[in-house]
Structures are given as structure tokens and as C-alpha cells.
Amino acid sequence: MIKSPFKWTTTWNGIILSDDNLILPNTWTITFDYNAIDDDLFRRDIAMQRLEYMFEEKFETSIWTNFSNPWVEILYEKMNTFIITLPAEPYDSLIASTALLKAQSITNGVFDFHSCSITSNLGYKVTNVIDIEEAVESNDSMYNEKFSDGPWYVRPDAGFTDILTTQDGDVTLIKDSKDWGDYNLNWDYYDDENIDSLEKYKHNNQKERWIPLIIKGGASDNED
């Protein structure tokens, strides 16, 4: 088993919509084991910000449910709550597996994820451990022909759900597939050799995280 030099843990709250149409509030804690394989500190920092965006902006307070749940289309049309669809009922193991695959996809070439572990209040705080090979095999076994480029959790974009709707008898797949540049979290800006390091730092420091590129003295106005 690969020994991971880094661990990152985060917690979020959300709601499960079960196949039995039960609405269940839940709190999850997940820990990722990974290695940093890119020496560029800007890219590492952006990778961490992408992970935080995934949990803080998309996973937090969202509804988790089966892609084929008939309530998905109704909730999508009537509510503003973000709905995250999965290929089966949203058990902890499947949530961990899809989160691990998405983490690998959105940090590809910068971080290399080996495994993750997840606990939740509804799961009696029992720890589920998923390695990356198991997650990949699970995704392959649940192949859906509706996804020509794969479901949200294997795409590298800033999308975090797929919604199936029916209008006038036509079935439409709505993909949440935004560009990371919309959130100043794209790699290209930092790969541009025409932009000097100070400008890259200022751009990145709009929401500074994880790796201090400059040691600051005195008071700081940063919220982090």
C-alpha cells in the first residue's frame, strides 16, 4: 500500500434524499490521503483552493440523491437548493468514492490521491475507507450511456452534478460544467510566462490558502 505524505480532512453538512423518499440531514467528515507531484507552489495552492471550493461552495448544504430519483427534476425546477446526483443511493461509501474521483480529476497532475476515509452521523460514525483503484472500478461498473464524457465526478471542470429533465417528451441531460477560470482557479494564468511572479501572487492571494509564498510581518487583513 502506498504511504501518503499528506492528509487533508474536512467536514460538511448536507441532506440525503433516499430512494424511499426520506429526507435525512447529515454531517460528514472525510480525510484524503495524497501526494503532491507538482513542484510549482502556485499550482499546489490552486489545487487546494479547488478542493475547498468543492466542499465549501458545492457540497455544503446540498441535497444528495440517486440520479434516477423522480424527485430530482421536481426539486431542480422548484427549489434553489443545489442537488448532487449519484449513480445509486447516496451511502457514505459512494459519496466517498465520487468525492475521491472528483478530487483526483480537478487536481490532476498536481496531486495524486491514494485513498480517502469517511464518517457520518447517520452512519454511526463508522469509518468507510476507499482507495483510488476501488473508486475507479466502482465508476466503471456503473457506466451510464447518457454521459459521453463521464459523470460530473470524473470530469476536470468545476461542475458537481448532472440533472436529467423531461420537457415535451424529450429527455435532456443538464451538466453542471463550469470553467475553473470563472472562479480564478484555472492553471493557465499561472503557466503564462509573460506574467511576473508578483502579479501571480496577487491574483492567487485573493483568497490565500495553504502555502505562504511570502512571509508577512505585522497585522494582516486576510480572513483566512
Predicted regions and their residues:
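Short, surface-exposed ligand- or partner-binding patches at beta-edge/loop junctions that are enriched
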Residues: 106-120
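Short hydrophobic short-linear motifs embedded
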Residues: 155, 163-167, 174-177, 192-221
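Histidine-centered catalytic/metal-coordination loop motif
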Residues: 17-101, 218-224
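Short, low-complexity, polybasic intrinsically disordered segments
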Residues: 117-157
